[in-house]
């Protein structure tokens, strides 16, 4: 793969003499204390500013600071006017604009398009602190404040909307966000390389419009520059000339007797064979090739062409062989350079080794930021995911090549967390990343990796060229456990269990030392139809992992349980598929409290299926394979009701559906039937989200286990508007439930005896 200039090899900007700031300034007063008269770069973000490497503005801000630039932060500005965008003054180089760690629409709306009651990235968890499509609004306000200052767009919202994309909330295809935002350049994916190069070149006096050769960037241009070879991919199913089949019984040797030849006379026949002179073609390299996608206007009006464009985009994501892409929007082209070169281990250590304070900015006082509470005692050990799940955006954003930190860097961060972060009790809440167990896993051959164009390394089966050795991760776990002051290392990131079963030693290490009672994994479904569209392994792999998990838990003398996640209404899912999943859940004693319906996020392959009804995992034509789509609100509710088969509120809908499907035999009181024949007098089922529901852990898991199928990465919300629980609060709830049960048993045991003293009730956690 092409080598890239290391991040730490750039010359430092003159302002390096100021040194690193305790926190990147959010006000003029802080700038004055630092001795700054202005900022070189101002980052505008939709999240609260937390100086922690799990937050994008902190990573980019600290990286630019290490290059010598003075970086200010405008976090969650009031977008109703330009005033907040001017509070740090005019930046010398550019505004860096991002919606935050999440797409602003996904952050605000549920999969059913209902407004969320909270925002985990805002102090106090309050909703409404950022606008819809925040990247657009912030960019426009920055232009209004300082018209001539370049705007560099980044973050996951911009990254996944860089191309003409289907917008679930408006149910239409929208322009590239670069067009709507009127930004000067867009950085997609993990943007460390691109932002450093853009900042360095702007500081050297280059104009933003001349920076067109940086990988991982998109920008607007009028036409394809000279020296580039354009590959036309704007159409599918190209019709060609069809020759009439010659009758085998006609004698064609006597051409003089042929009426066609006689009628032709001396006129030249365009179908007549001619001598062709072969000329040497100019050398065409992938580096100078650009693929022209169907225009915005075409994909807006033709869902099949939209699916085709999505397929081409995903085929051009390997940094080793990806070509540039271009898409016409009206009179201009949006040009997409190939993805950035993945960072080396040394560069990852450099980025994560910045002087982060690891706490929120002091301006927030004692206000809690729920997303920070979730990750403040966790450590990110890698980036990227080669799973390729079609509903997920991690692969599109971070890439398929795993970027790893060194053991030394990770252990140093744990020690810093132990020594600096208030409230650390010796428990590391997570040692992971996008997935728990892809650390140091890669292709056996760099040459094969360079030319590979597969969308997944583990679907339909694990690639024979993938090295599934978990030994480096096992060694890391053991080193981390041995650190002074560290009592427990938990693994909270989602586990890729199809990889884990390839290393029984890893599963044993994980189960014996790193599971806090529950381990979350994501089979997502049981049926082959939806699983193939998700690019997920079959349920048999889950069963194999479950047996290993239970075996090693028993050997360790621990009572531990798997928490499986499932998705309803994913493309490729039929009503029968959901019925079979419900039967599997009941047969295995699972009850889902929170249900996740498929959420069509921008640029995902599953979203292309949802919009077009075609499968972009295979060649797309107008006659190619169709995909079963769940779009109506009624059918989405039905699929969620199947997941919550135990909830009486869904039984009327399920009875009607089962009768329509010819499966009335599943209605009744029998053990192997799904729902009762009659409705109860009162709907007694209470969701775990409700304030008066039974706290987690109050019932012994194993019979009618409760599972959570919402894997947003955030803790469950209280339906009363209360803040999400962190892991310590969850532990308190479980302890409370155990105490309640013990008190009940003591009370029953003491009945009839003297001195029946009411046991003291423990304090109920919020």
Swiss-Prot record:
In what ranges is there compositional bias, type Basic and acidic residues?
723-735
The prosthetic group or cofactor this protein requires is: [4Fe-4S] cluster
- Please name the SMART domains in this protein's record: Elp3
The record places domain Radical SAM core at 371-649
Q: Which UniProt keywords apply?
A: 4Fe-4S, Iron, Iron-sulfur, Metal-binding, S-adenosyl-L-methionine
Residues annotated as region Disordered? 670-766
Under Pfam families, the record lists:
DUF3362, Radical_SAM, Radical_SAM_N
Identify the InterPro entries for this entry.
Elp3/MiaA/NifB-like_rSAM, Methylthiotransferase_CS, rSAM, rSAM_horseshoe, UPF0313, UPF0313_C, UPF0313_N
Sites binding [4Fe-4S] cluster sit at 385, 389, 392
**Cofactor descriptive note:** Binds 1 [4Fe-4S] cluster. The cluster is coordinated with 3 cysteines and an exchangeable S-adenosyl-L-methionine.
Q: Mind listing the GO molecular function terms for this protein?
A: 4 iron, 4 sulfur cluster binding; catalytic activity; iron ion binding
Name the protein family: Belongs to the UPF0313 family.
Query: Which PANTHER family does this entry report, sorted A to Z?
Result: UPF0313 PROTEIN YGIQ
Q: Which HAMAP family match?
A: UPF0313 (MF_01251)
> What is the protein name stated in its UniProt record?
UPF0313 protein PP_4872
């Amino acid at each position: 793969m092409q080598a890239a200039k290391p991040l730490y090899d750039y010359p430092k900007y003159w302002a390096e003499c100021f040194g690193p700031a305790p926190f990147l300034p959010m006000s003029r007063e802080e700038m004055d204390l630092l001795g700054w008269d202005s900022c070189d770069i101002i980052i505008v973000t939709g999240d609260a500013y937390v100086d922690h490497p799990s937050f994008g503005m902190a990573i980019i801000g600290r990286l630019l600071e290490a290059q010598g630039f003075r970086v200010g932060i405008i976090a969650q500005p009031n977008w109703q006017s330009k005033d907040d965008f001017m509070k740090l003054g005019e930046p010398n180089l550019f505004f860096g604009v991002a919606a935050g760690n999440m797409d602003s629409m996904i952050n605000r709306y549920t999969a059913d398009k209902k407004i969320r009651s909270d925002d985990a990235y805002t102090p106090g968890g309050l909703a409404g602190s950022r606008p819809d499509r925040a990247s657009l609004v912030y960019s426009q306000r920055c232009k209004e404040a300082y018209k001539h200052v370049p705007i560099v767009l980044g973050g996951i919202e911009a990254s996944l909307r860089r191309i003409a994309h289907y917008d679930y909330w408006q149910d239409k295809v929208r322009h590239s966000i670069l067009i709507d935002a009127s930004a000067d350049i867009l950085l997609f994916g993990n943007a460390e390389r691109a932002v450093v190069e853009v900042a360095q070149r702007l500081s050297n006096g280059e104009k933003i419009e001349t920076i067109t050769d940086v990988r991982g960037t998109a920008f607007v241009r009028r036409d394809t520059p000279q020296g580039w070879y354009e590959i036309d991919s704007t159409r599918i199913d190209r019709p060609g000339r069809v020759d009439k089949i010659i009758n085998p019984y006609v004698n064609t040797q006597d051409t003089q007797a042929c009426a066609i030849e006689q009628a032709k006379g001396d006129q030249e026949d365009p179908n007549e064979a001619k001598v062709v002179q072969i000329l040497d073609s100019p050398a065409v390299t992938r580096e100078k090739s650009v693929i022209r996608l169907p225009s915005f206007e075409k994909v807006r009006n033709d869902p099949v062409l939209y699916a085709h464009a999505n397929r081409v985009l995903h085929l051009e994501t390997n940094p080793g062989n990806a070509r540039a892409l271009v898409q016409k929007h009206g009179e201009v082209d949006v040009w997409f350079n190939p993805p950035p070169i993945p960072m080396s281990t040394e560069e990852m250590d450099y980025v994560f080794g910045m002087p982060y304070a690891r706490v929120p900015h002091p301006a927030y006082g004692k206000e809690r930021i729920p997303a920070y509470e979730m990750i403040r005692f966790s450590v990110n050990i890698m980036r990227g995911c080669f799973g390729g799940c079609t509903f997920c955006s991690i692969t599109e954003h971070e890439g398929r090549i795993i970027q790893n930190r060194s053991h030394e860097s990770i252990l140093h961060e744990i020690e810093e967390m132990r020594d600096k972060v208030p409230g650390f009790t010796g428990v590391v809440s997570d040692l992971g990343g996008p997935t728990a167990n892809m650390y140091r896993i890669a292709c056996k051959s760099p040459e094969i990796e360079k030319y590979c164009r597969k969308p997944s390394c583990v679907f339909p089966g694990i690639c024979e060229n993938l090295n599934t050795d978990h030994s480096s991760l096992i060694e890391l776990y053991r080193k981390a456990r041995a650190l002074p002051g560290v009592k427990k290392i938990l693994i909270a990131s989602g586990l890729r269990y199809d990889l884990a079963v390839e290393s029984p030693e890893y599963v044993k290490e994980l189960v014996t030392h790193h599971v806090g009672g529950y381990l979350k994994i994501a089979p997502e479904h049981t049926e082959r139809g939806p699983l193939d569209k998700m690019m997920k392994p079959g349920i048999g792999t889950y069963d194999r992992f479950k047996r290993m998990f239970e075996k090693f838990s028993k050997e360790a003398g621990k009572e531990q349980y798997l928490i499986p996640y499932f998705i309803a209404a994913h493309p490729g899912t039929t009503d029968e598929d959901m019925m079979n999943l419900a039967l599997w859940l009941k047969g295995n004693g699972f009850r889902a409290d929170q249900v996740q319906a498929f959420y069509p996020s921008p640029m995902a392959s599953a979203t292309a299926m949802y919009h077009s009804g075609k499968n972009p995992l295979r060649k797309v034509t107008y006659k190619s394979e169709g995909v079963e789509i769940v779009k109506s609100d009624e059918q989405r509710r039905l699929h969620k009701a199947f997941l919550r088969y135990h909830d009486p509120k869904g039984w009327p809908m399920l009875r009607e559906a089962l009768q329509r499907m010819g499966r009335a035999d599943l209605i009744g009181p029998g053990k192997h039937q799904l729902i009762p024949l009659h409705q109860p007098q009162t709907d007694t089922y209470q969701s775990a989200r409700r304030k008066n529901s039974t706290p987690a852990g109050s019932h012994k898991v194993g019979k009618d286990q409760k599972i959570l199928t919402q894997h947003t990465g955030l803790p469950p919300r209280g339906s009363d508007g209360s803040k999400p629980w962190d892991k310590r609060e969850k532990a308190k709830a479980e302890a409370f439930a155990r105490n309640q049960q013990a008190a009940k048993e003591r009370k029953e045991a003491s009945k009839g005896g003297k001195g029946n003293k009411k046991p003291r009730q423990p304090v109920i956690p919020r």
